[in-house]
Each structure stands twice: as C-alpha cells, then as structure tokens.
Curated annotation (Swiss-Prot):
Cited SMART domains: HDc (SM00471)
Gene3D superfamilies listed in its UniProt record: Hypothetical protein af1432
GTP-binding among keywords: no
Family: Belongs to the 5DNU family.
GO MF assignments: 5'-deoxynucleotidase activity; metal ion binding; nucleotide binding
Gene this protein is translated from: yfbR
Function: Catalyzes the strictly specific dephosphorylation of 2'-deoxyribonucleoside 5'-monophosphates.
Entry annotated with the keyword S-adenosyl-L-methionine: no
PROSITE patterns according to UniProt: HD
Protein name from the UniProt record: 5'-deoxynucleotidase YfbR
GO cellular component: cytoplasm
Species per Swiss-Prot/TrEMBL record: Escherichia coli O1:K1 / APEC
UniProt site (Appears to be important in orienting the phosphate for catalysis): 18
EC number, UniProt record: 3.1.3.89
Pfam families noted in UniProt: YfbR-like (PF12917)
Amino acid sequence: MKQSHFFAHLSRLKLINRWPLMRNVRTENVSEHSLQVAMVAHALAAIKNRKFGGNVNAERIALLAMYHDASEVLTGDLPTPVKYFNSQIAQEYKAIEKIAQQKLVDMVPEELQDIFAPLIDEHAYSDEEKSLVKQADALCAYLKCLEELAAGNNEFLLAKTRLEATLEARRSQEMDYFMEVFVPSFHLSLDEISQDSPL
C-alpha cells in the first residue's frame, strides 16, 4: 500500500504562526485557529438553521472550516496587508492557494480523494457555505484582537477596527446573534466567566 504524506503535512499547521508581523501576547498557530473557526462556523450554521429558517449542513460547515486554511501548510500564512496590498497580488495569491489545495488533494490516496477534495478545494463550496466559513474566520480574528487588547496589547487596535468593518460587510442574522450572545464574554476574566457555574 502506497504511503501518503497528507496528514504529516497537516500536522505541521501547528508550526505556522498567525499574525506574523504583529507583537502577540500569546502566539496563535494555524492549527488552533482552524479548530476555533470550525467551532464558530458550526455554531453560525446551527443558529442559522434553528433561529432564522436556514437549511445548511452544520457538520459539513464545521468540516469546511476545519480545512479552510489547510493549504497554508504549503504556502505559509501571508500577512493580510501583504495578501491584499493590491488586486494583482490578491489574484496571484488565490492562484497559488488553488495550486496548493490541489497538491494536498493529490497527496490523499486515490480511493479517498473524492471525500477530501470537496473539503480542501474551496471552489467546491457553495456560496452559502463559503459565506458562513468567511464569517467564522473573521469572527475568530476579531476575537483574537479582543483577547490581545484585553491583555494590554494595543498593537491590535487597528486590526480590530479593520475587522469590525469586515464583520459589518459580512453581517448576517446568525452573526448578529453570535455577537450578542457569545462575544461579550470575551471581555471578561476567567473568574467572571466562571462565577455562574462553579464546579
């Protein structure tokens, strides 16, 4: 049986730090970011279905979010100001991402590729799926800013402002619900979020 390097590559996502040009109180890697995005995307999909008449597969959304940055194991995490410096760079980077996504799919044993390709290749996402994952991705970046600012790191002030504009552009009913119900707790200390539920 032929060996595959697919999961050995994915395990290296934990070695790629996000926010590489920013001073961080706590470094965040792509692996842990992907898990948080998967949890938030799943929540957004569940909220959409339960509260706002949606009909999306919340489990699939979680899987798409889990793999949404997988290609960065081959490309690295390009800082946002560089990635979107101009439309030409953004377009070229998208092409590089597409090549990296295909390279990852090609690492998967052939008999499993039809399972993993639709998770890794973002061109297989529906518009609704893509929107939910992008909302979750932006929300998690925003939450990172809140955590850094709460720790006294003003380096993230401008990033927070930019992400607020991104969130406004991607705004949805499910995002509004998430922002109202879950986000305020990120401004609180461990003692404050623990006082209502002692062990």
